[in-house]
Amino acid sequence: MTYEVIIADDVSTDATAEISRFVDGLVICRNQTNQGFLRNCNQAAKAAKGKYIMFLNNDTKVTEGWLSSLVNLIESDDTIGMVGSKLVYPDGRLQEAGGIIWSDGSGWNYGRLDDPDKAEYNYVKDVDYISGAAILLSVDLWKQIGGFDERFAPAYCEDSDLAFEVRKAGYRVVYQPLSKVIHFEGVSNGTDVNGTGLKRYQVENSQKLKEKWADEFKKQCVNDGNPNPFRARERSQGKKVILVVDHYVPTFDKDAGSKTTYQYLKMFLKKGYVVKFLGDNFLHEEPYSTTLQQMGIEILYGDHWATGLWDWLKLNKDEIDVAYLNRPHIATKYVDFIKENTNIKVIYYGHDLHFLRLGREYELTGDINIKREADYWRAIELSMMRKAAISYYPSYVEINAIHAIDPEIKAKAIPAYVYDHFLGDIQEDFAKREGLLFVGGFAHPPNADAVLWFAKEIFPYIREQLPDIKFYVVGSKVTDEIKALEQPGNGIIIKGFVSEEELANLYASCKVVVVPLRYGAGVKGKVVEAIYNGAPIITTSTGAEGIPQVEQVLEVEDDPKTFADKTVALYQDNDRCRQMCEGTQKYIREHFSMDGAWKVIEEDFSR
């Protein structure tokens, strides 16, 4: 990024006066008489020519990415008016992860002297204020406000006041944990509030701040002498809080279940919820954890949470509205404690109905061990559903299977994927596309079975008619058996895990997506994703299960030879491919949009 450095020199007596001899390109604003911190900032800010102005104290040391992370954040959301850094002492302890102003006017540097790497200090959040040692806002907003209010001259509380002014102007004040600044607090103005130095103004100006913003202070969280900062630390008073629990932080580019969780997390944020996320492995996994934290989601990770979660739930039981528990093997670990110790509403999302999927696999294979596994999961899943306020699955097929066993269970079908952005530039010239594509993670057994079946029973028929055709296989955790399918000259190309960008390119360049699933349950995320990407698709009845108005977007066939023939026919019919592609975005808007999904579940989220 381009930037200018303005030195606000308030009649310094050290080597600052000679800095232009050693550093080129500086804008130096040197006062003739000492103005004090506040007026010095106001005066020097007049020289700023850029879009943003960053106030950085002289008693600081910056770290890698400190500035770009602030700029990226403020430019990501036009409701944000001011952003600020995580401040850390030279000894590595935390000085502040945003500031709290209580209703009585008292203030906290949230997290002071704690470990700055703890989860609660590392997500983007609204805050009451950010210490002025490192804050950034637009020059236009700075001018609109009029700079620091000079009633707080020479120093102290001007940063808190500025934050309230930013909110008065209709914008948010937001903390950016990726911007880490080491602050040698007290070097500039000392630490004695009772002495004759500048620090004494801290007490006087606190009273002025309280008087100026008396009406606003009434809306602040209450300090009862031992306050719980759960809401005050992120200005979440009046907002609903949802705790989402899954097996781990969603690896949204690796598997369909993670993508579902990730998209619903985004939807909850969009609908105004404060979102807390708990991965059952308590790990901080990159780049996925930082992605969620930069969205504003607090992730409960680390040994502190592994041992302290139950106490945290008890302490904050009245602050959390909904516990959204994913997958039966995870949800069962938490549901009993939540129901026995809190009034938090439990909503359960099973992802797929395990006993139905395994029952179908047993019917296909006759393996008695799979039948035993299906029976085991049937007991687990039904027990979990009976404990939840309501349970979700991706298709009515699963809901009907549940109600065939127990009509009293409250359950409904919800969209497997939910989108808030729709594609507008899909390549519809199918004469320029080539190859078949399969996408699916191989930790999920139905996907491995599908590729093996296609490669052995279907693809040879296709190659007889289209000898040069390629079959691209994409997915994480590729097994050795899948890798062995790729042989010289056989047209099978095992891509394995690819980035989101490369996957988008494959969707745009491959002609037909095949989803040859022989067993499974519910709506398949890979099918919805392929529709979203405008792909002509051929699948089985299992792959098409739960897809509404399936004839609009899919070709369906279960017989291997006929599947091959239909694939060849579709591959050679560019007009049919284009017709299937043209309707995909309208279809996704109707059936798999965030707003549409919220209409289905909104009534379930009342406390």
Residue ranges and their predicted role:
Residues 1-33:
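Acidic donor-binding segment of Leloir-type glycosyltransferases
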Residues 31-48, 64:
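Glycine-rich, basic loop-to-helix element that forms the pyrophosphate-binding segment
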Residues 53:
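Short aromatic/hydrophobic "clamp" motif used to bind/position activated sugar donors
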Residues 60-102:
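Conserved donor NDP-sugar-binding/catalytic core segment of glycosyltransferases
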Residues 65-71, 122, 126-146, 151-182:
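A short, conserved alpha-helix in the catalytic core of glycosyltransferases
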Residues 85, 103-128, 143:
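Short, flexible, basic/aromatic active-site loop/helix in glycosyltransferases
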Residues 253, 257-266, 277, 386-387, ...:
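Conserved catalytic-core segment of nucleotide-activated headgroup transferases in glycan assembly
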Residues 319-321, 389, 508-522, 535:
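Acidic donor-binding loop of glycosyltransferase active sites
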